[in-house]
Amino acid sequence: MINYLWFVLAAFCEIAGCYAFYLWLRLGKSALWVLPGLLSLSLFALLLTRVEASYAGRAYAAYGGIYVAASLFWLAFVERSRPLWSDWLGVALCVLGASIVLFGPRLSQ
């Protein structure tokens, strides 16, 4: 269960870090946004290593579904833009795929 917490925290750190660079490079904000961006992206990497998984690739694939869902929450609550029905459908498909990766049968470990 703790893995889900790590995934969610990592997702918001990754999104925040990338958004800091977006503010600087796309919206013309101060280059000082790079500092919290780098800190947030470093914290993202650290948090993702806390996930208990036999293989990093499988953990990252499962994380992808959480990341996509967190991105829509960021869109809604930070950028104040309402997600479209197609956004939610895309998230549902990603989460379904991540669930298959996460909970699918393992022939050999």
From Swiss-Prot:
Q: Which residues cross the membrane?
A: 5-25, 27-47, 59-79, 84-104
Q: Which protein, by its recorded name, is this?
A: UPF0060 membrane protein PSPA7_1846
What family, per the record? Belongs to the UPF0060 family.
Top-level taxon of the source organism: Bacteria
What GO cellular component term, any one, is given?
plasma membrane
Q: Which UniProt keywords apply?
A: Cell inner membrane, Cell membrane, Membrane, Transmembrane, Transmembrane helix
Q: How does it sit in the membrane?
A: Multi-pass membrane protein
Q: Where in the cell is it found?
A: Cell inner membrane
Return the HAMAP family for the record: UPF0060
Organism name: Pseudomonas paraeruginosa (strain DSM 24068 / PA7) (Pseudomonas aeruginosa (strain PA7))
What is the protein's major site of localization?
membrane
